[in-house]
């Protein structure tokens, strides 16, 4: 217990340290530290709970001891001259294991990634909360800048970010050797990223989120200073309200003093980011937009040594053009509402035109993503998945049900759902044709054979607030607040838009 308490105190000091972290490299060789770090999420922090864990558990003490031995046997020459040797690649995976545990204690909580699979519902972790924020805030903005934060940056940039907190030279040299050897291990687009183990993927996500955290941690304070310095004064007439009361109580003498009062109205800057896609919305003229672009280009150049071109920043006017973000087409639309006013002797009706936030589905892009996945051809006609004919009938139905459930929940907040109904039609016929190919029959025979089971496959969604519910009208949008990651088909839509914008 004394050893555990000492290590727990060590972990506490490491997590509380804000500027200087000197002795981190020796922690890679403490097996008890690995055990407690991997078990810190549970309430039982003891060696007894670790020893009695299942032998198939990945983070048992036996595996941890083997991990320590591999790290101790690692040499610098193997790191420098390993090439593409698979044996050396397996040896270096142990270093990624240790660095992942260590960085999870060092990196601030704000930059740690959200858990992708949660057992409990938590609306604060939903990516749809971004759209709720945009509905509330973006209405007052007339200029939107779309910026893609680069993934491909030099590995030395991460080392410089760590040097602000870590003062252990040995650990920094070890991290530098690994990063330069693997070129860019924190870029998910590289083929090496998919060849890594889960711990290395977790390290890559952790480093990228820390990179975004440092970027935002420098940018937001500058914006706060900008808001405080660039205040605009407006005149406001106070003597025009309640004139009878003022005349009765002799407030007319104060009219020269109350006629002009300056009120400060600060410009609103709204910032939204998901992964490496960010949006900056504000209210300003064209000259202010150009100043913002120059500011962002200079910010990336002098702070991160990344030469951002002005053409890489997408400029949108929400009143004129729509913009795409996270698989949605976002914009504003005008809507007329009736306002009834009642008086003592009469009543009147007036019409008001208001603007509201509108999120729609990119139907053509959604159909093309379904085509790429093999559910329909290039013209949008449903086709069967021949690769799924080896599965059981229930497995085929469950696969289509899961795809439709994810799509319907993700696009639940869209204003017009015509694209969803078309996607549902494609998935239904694709499912029928897949079953028909398996049984060497026709779609009509398949429908008659499965009956109600086939009809209800794509009509029931696991979320209680699904699109076909009578509780919510088709004119109202409902954002499902239990979604913490994007749908795979939506990712294909984003990849296509990025390729078109880059070309």
Swiss-Prot record:
Q: Name one cellular component (GO) term.
A: chloroplast
Species of provenance: Psilotum nudum (Whisk fern)
Identify this protein by name: Maturase K
Q: Spell out the HAMAP family in the cross-references.
A: MatK
Keyword set includes Chaperone? no
Sorted alphabetically, the keyword list is:
Chloroplast, mRNA processing, Plastid, RNA-binding, tRNA processing
* PANTHER family referenced in this protein's UniProt entry, alphabetically: MATURASE K (PTHR34811:SF1)
What does the entry give for GO biological process? mRNA processing; RNA splicing; tRNA processing
What one GO molecular function would you report for this record?
RNA binding
The record's subcellular locations are: Plastid, Chloroplast
Q: Gene encoding it?
A: matK
- Free-text function comment from the UniProt entry: Usually encoded in the trnK tRNA gene intron. Probably assists in splicing its own and other chloroplast group II introns.
Q: Which family does it belong to?
A: Belongs to the intron maturase 2 family. MatK subfamily.
């Amino acid at each position: 217990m004394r050893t555990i308490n000492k290590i727990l105190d060590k972990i506490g000091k490491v997590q509380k340290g804000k500027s200087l972290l000197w002795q981190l490299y020796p922690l890679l060789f403490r097996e008890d530290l690995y055990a407690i770090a991997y078990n810190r999420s549970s309430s039982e922090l003891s060696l007894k709970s670790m020893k009695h864990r299942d032998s198939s558990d990945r983070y048992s003490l036996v595996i941890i001891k083997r991990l320590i031995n591999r790290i101790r046997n690692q040499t610098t020459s193997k790191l420098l001259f390993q090439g593409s040797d698979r044996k050396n690649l397996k040896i270096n995976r142990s270093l990624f294991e240790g660095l992942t545990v260590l960085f999870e204690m060092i990196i601030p909580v704000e930059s740690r990634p959200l858990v992708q699979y949660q057992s409990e519902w938590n609306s604060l972790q939903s990516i749809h909360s971004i759209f709720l924020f945009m509905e509330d805030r973006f209405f007052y903005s007339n200029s939107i800048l779309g910026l893609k934060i680069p993934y491909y940056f030099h590995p030395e940039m991460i080392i410089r970010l760590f040097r602000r907190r870590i003062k252990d030279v040995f650990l920094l040299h070890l991290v530098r050797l690994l990063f330069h050897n693997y070129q860019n291990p924190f870029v998910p687009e590289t083929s090496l990223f998919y060849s890594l183990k889960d711990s290395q993927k977790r390290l890559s996500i952790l480093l990228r989120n820390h990179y975004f955290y440092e970027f935002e941690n420098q940018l937001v304070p500058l914006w706060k200073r900008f808001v405080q310095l660039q205040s605009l004064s407006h005149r406001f007439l106070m003597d025009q309200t309640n004139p009878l009361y003022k005349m009765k109580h002799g407030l007319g003498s104060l009219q020269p003093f109350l006629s002009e009062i300056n009120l400060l109205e600060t410009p609103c800057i709204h910032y939204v980011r998901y992964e490496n896609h960010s949006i900056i919305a504000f209210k300003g003229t064209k000259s202010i937009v150009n100043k913002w672009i120059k500011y962002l280009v200079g910010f990336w150049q002098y702070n991160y040594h990344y030469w951002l071109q002005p053409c890489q920043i997408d400029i949108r006017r929400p009143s004129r053009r729509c913009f795409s973000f996270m698989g949605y087409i976002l914009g504003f639309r005008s809507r007329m509402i009736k306002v009834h006013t009642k008086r003592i002797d009469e009543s009147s009706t007036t019409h008001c035109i208001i603007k509201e936030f509108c999120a729609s589905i990119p139907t053509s892009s959604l159909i093309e993503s379904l085509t790429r996945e093999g559910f329909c051809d290039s013209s949008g006609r449903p086709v069967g998945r021949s690769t799924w004919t080896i599965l059981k009938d229930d497995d085929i139905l469950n696969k289509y049900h899961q795809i439709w459930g994810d799509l319907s929940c993700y696009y639940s907040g869209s204003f017009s759902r015509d694209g969803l109904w078309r996607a549902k039609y494609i998935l239904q016929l694709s499912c029928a044709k897949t079953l028909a190919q398996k049984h060497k029959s026709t779609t009509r025979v398949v429908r008659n054979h499965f009956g109600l089971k086939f009809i209800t496959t794509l009509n029931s969604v696991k979320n209680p607030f699904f699109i076909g519910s009578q509780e919510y009208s088709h004119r109202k949008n409902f954002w499902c607040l239990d979604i913490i990651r994007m749908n795979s088909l939506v990712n294909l839509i984003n990849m296509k838009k990025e390729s078109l914008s880059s070309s």
